[in-house]
């Protein structure tokens, strides 16, 4: 099992951002051609132009590297805009979430977290929960603005909304298309709006 400690202190020099970027880019590039199980730190290091020791020193394992690469990508794309209209914000996040999860990187992470409980726990803690909290804040804003029913169970409502995305990608192996996302969002909004 992996020891995925998010508060790790790394000995030695701080990470070189150019090398970090090269390693993450190499990881994403190689995942287009190789299954995660067949991807090695040696291959990533060669593609990135760094030593294997650099990768092991910074991440400890390819699973840790995979998760951090996914998080880095998701942090750029799967972001709530608390100022946007409610429906637009949910749609943007669902579209971006679908794209990220359906990418070679996302599919590799899905495979890895289904096989590694520690990695799943880290995914939940570092990706899923922060976005769920942001979505809950968005619902709270809708309630405060008088747009959404005050008596909704936000956890259940968010499970209903995002469950379709995760179900399709994790279990059916397909991403939702824009038309399906629109249908889901329309039904979702009808159920929670005043």
Where are these regions (language model features)?
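Basic, helix-initiating cap at the start of DNA-binding domains
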Residues: 1-34, 38-47, 64
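C-terminal peripheral helix-coil segments that are non-catalytic and often amphipathic
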Residues: 1-8, 92, 99, 133-141, ...
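Amphipathic alpha-helical segments used for helix-helix packing
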Residues: 69-70, 101-122
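Short, basic, alpha-helical segments at the C-terminal edge of helix-turn-helix-like DNA-binding modules
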Residues: 70-77
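Hydrophobic alpha-helical connector segments
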Residues: 78-104, 157
């Amino acid at each position: 099992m992996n020891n995925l400690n998010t508060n790790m202190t790394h000995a030695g020099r701080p990470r070189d951002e150019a090398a970090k970027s090269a390693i993450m880019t190499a990881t994403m590039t190689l995942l287009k051609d190789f299954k995660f199980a067949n991807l090695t730190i040696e291959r990533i290091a060669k593609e990135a132009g760094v030593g294997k020791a650099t990768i092991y020193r910074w991440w400890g394992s390819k699973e840790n590297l995979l998760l951090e690469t996914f998080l880095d990508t998701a942090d750029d794309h799967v972001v709530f805009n608390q100022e946007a209209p409610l429906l637009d914000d949910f749609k943007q996040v669902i579209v971006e979430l679908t794209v990220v999860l359906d990418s070679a990187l996302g599919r590799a992470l899905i495979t890895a977290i289904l096989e590694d409980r520690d990695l799943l726990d880290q995914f939940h803690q570092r990706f899923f929960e922060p976005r769920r909290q942001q979505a809950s804040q968005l619902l709270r804003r809708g309630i405060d603005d008088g747009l959404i029913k005050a008596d909704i169970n936000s956890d259940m409502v968010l499970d209903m909304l995002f469950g379709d995305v995760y179900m399709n990608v994790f279990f059916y192996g397909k991403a939702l298309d824009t038309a399906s996302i629109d249908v889901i969002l329309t039904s979702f909004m009808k159920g929670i709006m005043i």
